[in-house]
């Protein structure tokens, strides 16, 4: 791949500014520099001034509907990047997070770098997820996706808007369509 492709970090959020602040601070410290951040903010009340404190290339979209998969799809449509990095508004990452996802895509000639998410800070990655392998999971809170995948299989299915598992369905659809997805510990 291009040595430094543009990556859009996509974050839907809903009334979680206290957590989102740490997310943004983690993104400011990334070793990989060619990225922008698209936040689809569904909060009520919406706090536009919150975003002024961060030194990031930010595109903040206010969305009135409280619909997770609609928010992710809207950010995809707004992005100009070839790579989309799906992230959650309460996650924490190291300084090389984006860089490691890009390296995984490049090294394995993959379409998706499927990261592992842990429920608690300092939690242990399960042994079966502690090495690179063909992915059997897709977590929309930690995955880098080549835009070509979305052109091939479509966006997130909106029937999951009022429930979870939209990312699970997306991962199955990617697998069925022969998309190369690598589990990135």
Which ranges hold each PLM region?
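N-proximal low-complexity "stem/linker" segments adjacent to membrane-targeting elements
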Residues: 1-26
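Glycine-rich, basic loop-to-helix element that forms the pyrophosphate-binding segment
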Residues: 62-79
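Cell-envelope/extracellular polymer assembly enzymes that use nucleotide-activated donors
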Residues: 5-8, 36, 169
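Acidic donor-binding segment of Leloir-type glycosyltransferases
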Residues: 24-62
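Acidic donor-binding loop at a coil-to-helix junction in glycosyltransferase catalytic cores
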Residues: 163-170
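Conserved donor NDP-sugar-binding/catalytic core segment of glycosyltransferases
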Residues: 96-127
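Catalytic beta-strand/loop signature of glycosyltransferases that borders the donor
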Residues: 181-185
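Short aromatic/hydrophobic "clamp" motif used to bind/position activated sugar donors
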Residues: 84
